[in-house]
Amino acid sequence: MMTALSFEATQADFPLPTLGPLLLSIAEDCKRGRGFGVLRGLPVQRWTRIQSLIAYWGFSLYWGRLQHQNEKAHLIGHVKEVVDPTNAKSTTRLYMTRKAQPWHVDASDLVSLLFLKTAKSGGLSGWASSSTIYNEILRTRPDLIPVLAGTWYMDRKKEVPPGKKPYFVLPILNWHEGHLTISWNDTYYQLPPKLYPGEVPPLTPQQEEAIQVWRDTASRPDISINMWLQPGDVQLLQNHNIVHNRSEFEDHEHVDDKRHLLRLWLSPEDARPLPEHFSDLWGGVTPGARGGVGFKTGPEGGVFPLEAEVGQQKL
């Protein structure tokens, strides 16, 4: 684990006179423009792991405050297959497997990925504008808009903050102070009725249909894009109006060659306002201090693991 990187550091501690303005511009475009950006060409193939982590942490100082990505308080996550999908449980987070990840958002204002190594085949990154998906459903199936804005139970995938239930309620469509914030996590809606049948009602036929219509609309080639990202590429996405996915992949045999990405969850201090009910998942709605999972400690108690982990076992 790396713990020396300071949570209280600022851009002045990591000056980037040429690259810094570009990082700020990308973040601004994500927050108030197209919602995503890609930076290409970081020399990760000649950097050590620690150098890559430090450089990526430095980027975060230009984008927002880091938030915990799991109950172990990881502030930089490792997206890597560490669980065989044939043995994975329903509560396993899919980023730890090679299985396809359906359309979803992460529990943060911004999410970033740094590609260290790519898969042997597959593993394409897909993005779609959830605002465009909403507009298309409003045009073709307006009857589903009240359904999407209704009550949806979501599973916490066994990462339950103290005093919370293993599920929570969060509408897909959220209007607040002039913003439409869209929260979409495809597979998280089906689990609570199965795992907690005495507490969570089953999905209604209208909800089942809304899920399928959303999936089909998001996957249309005129709405979504797919990219094959390379080692050294950095992507930054805004979760409130962009959904993303990943195709299934075949990995390399040798452990040193396996697909490996680093991930940041970020909360900018100038992020949009969110309705109070986001607090049940995000631990609050104050920009710069919201998002993530776990909430066992403040972000200043986070760690920077050098490698992917499952439980206490490093892989």
Describe the role of every protein-language-model region.
Residues 1-19, 24-25, 32, 37, ...:
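Active-site environment of non-heme Fe oxygenases that use a 2-His-1-carboxylate facial triad
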Residues 56-66:
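A short alpha->loop->secondary-structure connector
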